[in-house]
Amino acid sequence: MLKYWLGIVGLFVWGGCSTSFTPQEVKVIKEGGGIMRVWKTDNREDSLFLRQQAIELTPGEIRTELFQVLKQRMLATVNDSADPGVGIAAPQVGISRRLIAVQRYDKPGAPFEFYINPGIVSASEEQSLGKEGCLSVPDVVGEVWRSNEIVVRYIPELTSIKRMLSREKTDSTFKFEVKVEYRNTWEP
């Protein structure tokens, strides 16, 4: 019984620890509609911003209408017919939060799915070579070796931590979005 109550109290406390989006983030999320400006590495200010460590989203932020608007606008941006992508991270649209949208080629219809506070738990040693580009790195496409399978940890909108296995093209997109946007281990 004590474990039960501690669990409930823990969820309440964790759920109650809410920081807010900054006034600048609120402005970026709300301004305009649909497609957002993609921050680019060939712009000095954008590049410096993209290199910052992104902040984890809190349960309080995840439950806001603003979070839903951010997701809708990120999806519109990654699906922009003028510059489509297979993945996008919140920092790429000026929001320093750990949120990515990944096109799931391993699912029927290749839908986009969002992942909150993602992290790569493990990666297979077996790798494949594939072409990659990035919405934030204009006019650069290269071949990169990526693990064939990865295990990703993330928090779904319902607040429990989950793990999933990703394979092939989807795996490559996950690794790129998580590594580039949150670990700052790349050079443009």
Where are these regions (language model features)?
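Positively charged
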Residues: 17-188
